[in-house]
Regions:
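PRY/SPRY (B30.2) beta-sandwich protein-interaction domains
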Residues: 1-176
Length: 176
């Protein structure tokens, strides 16, 4: 609608003043259902072998074959500066599962679990953190349906995990 150029149709009420624009400058904006998608190219199990995993929902969900190994998938695009944040929904977490959400640096070899090497850290479903192969007290436990946030601050070498929006505390990480 060229007559409504600059009018926000979302519930946010961000209407803008239009200067030197005409209907030819107008394009439709579809802000709903925008998600960044994960580019998963590496998936491993604890033995360091390639793992059968499938992805659905625009690569927003990883489905593992549940062969008895600890299984994980890595994003393929690393970062080396700045501050980054993502959130994920915990699914299929059980009392006996070794569910972890973590951050790995470029030197991670793909063997062992996230947090087993000094080049990685993880937030475990039981509320512990794992850094350099050692578990220690960290935050609240999480289970199915919880939203886990990960704030990576490469500039200050910290990662902070969030459970349903509540910070669990900053963890120092090895830069690389």
């Amino acid at each position: 609608n060229a007559a409504a150029l600059g009018t926000d149709s979302s519930p946010n009420g961000n209407t803008f003043t239009v200067n030197n624009l005409t209907s030819i400058d107008q394009s439709t904006d579809y802000p709903e259902v925008n998600f960044c998608t994960w580019n998963p190219l590496r998936f491993w199990n604890r033995s360091g072998t390639l793992q059968k995993v499938s992805f659905d929902n625009g690569n927003l969900r990883a489905i593992f074959d549940d062969n008895g190994y600890n299984e994980y998938a890595f994003a393929s695009i690393g970062v080396d500066t700045g501050k980054w944040f993502c959130e994920m929904k915990a699914e299929d977490v059980t009392a006996t599962a070794n569910t972890r959400i973590g951050v790995l640096n470029m030197d991670y070899t793909g063997t062992g679990n996230p947090g087993d090497q000094s080049t990685s850290v993880s937030y475990m479903a039981n509320g512990q953190k794992r850094v350099g192969g050692s578990n220690s007290s960290y935050g609240a436990s999480y289970t199915n349906g919880d939203i886990i946030g990960v704030a990576l601050d490469v500039t200050n070498n910290t990662v902070t995990f969030y459970k349903n929006g509540a910070s669990q505390g900053a963890i120092s990480i090895t830069a690389n």
